[in-house]
């Protein structure tokens, strides 16, 4: 069994805000207010995801985060005490490799969102560039998001939590999840000893390896941070040509097979 890391209506009923910084994304710590300028909070109804600002008008997230009347919040740190430079947009257009209803957890869990108007760079808002090359196994990668910070129940953090994990060989995830295909356009990342991981509510957020935006939170173990069960992230470098084509105006561009 695997867990898609989006916060659903049934889970939101268990929602409570974290009171202790020591209740650690899973195993993380509150992010520095200045280290997540490209991180977007994506909300619609009772659902929560994250996204990544890649230029003033475009955000990348996971296809399984798609929803109606989606709002994209930039410049957010504390959800209770908004930054003065917080900016909120809605999705003008959304692009997928597959229908958002037909994505698979093995492949193409990616959504490119065009905002209804550009955001302005500010103290807490700035885009991150697409990767110039694929990541290297063994890289230290940063994860971040407002998802649950407890494995026993859904406890959403008021501020994003950050943690460092390792980029692992894809074969490690195949050993953990035998149903995985021999190859896929995903990255395997985590801590084999367990304890640090993305979790429910972190879907769509970034995996930043050696300063480059390399992955999108997709799915993982039913128990976040479990030993020998790392998570899977959409491999951004495989989609840069498609992303750049869409942004350039070629809305019929096709994704890699």
From Swiss-Prot:
It is found in: Secreted. Pfam families: Trypsin. GO terms for biological process: proteolysis; regulation of blood pressure. Its EC number is 3.4.21.-. Expressed by the venom gland. Residues 1-18 form the signal peptide. GO terms for molecular function: serine-type endopeptidase activity; toxin activity. Residues 25-248 form the Peptidase S1 domain. Residues 19-24 form a propeptide. Monomer. This is Thrombin-like enzyme KN-BJ 2. It comes from Bothrops jararaca.
């Amino acid at each position: 069994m695997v867990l898609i890391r989006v916060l659903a209506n049934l889970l939101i009923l268990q929602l409570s805000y974290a009171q202790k910084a020591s209740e650690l994304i899973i195993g993380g710590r509150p992010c520095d207010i200045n280290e997540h300028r490209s991180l977007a909070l994506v909300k619609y109804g009772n659902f929560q995801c994250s996204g990544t600002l890649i230029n003033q008008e475009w955000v990348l997230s996971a296809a399984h985060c798609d929803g109606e009347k989606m709002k994209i919040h930039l410049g957010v740190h504390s959800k209770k005490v908004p930054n003065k430079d917080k900016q909120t947009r809605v999705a003008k257009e959304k692009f997928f490799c597959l229908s958002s209803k037909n994505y698979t957890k093995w492949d193409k869990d990616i959504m490119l969102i065009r905002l209804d108007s550009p955001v302005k760079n500010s103290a807490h808002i700035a885009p991150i560039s697409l990767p110039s090359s694929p990541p290297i196994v063994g890289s230290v990668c940063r994860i971040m998001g407002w998802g649950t910070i407890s494995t026993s129940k859904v406890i959403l953090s008021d501020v994003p939590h950050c943690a460092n994990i390792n980029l692992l060989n894809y074969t490690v995830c195949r050993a953990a999840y035998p149903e995985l295909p021999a190859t896929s356009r995903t990255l395997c990342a985590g801590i084999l000893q367990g304890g640090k991981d993305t979790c429910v509510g972190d879907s769509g957020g970034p995996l930043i390896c050696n300063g480059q935006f390399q992955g999108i939170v997709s799915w993982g173990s039913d128990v976040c941070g479990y030993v020998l069960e790392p998570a899977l992230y959409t491999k951004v470098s495989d989609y840069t040509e498609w992303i750049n084509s869409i942004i350039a105006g070629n809305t019929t561009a096709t994704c890699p097979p």
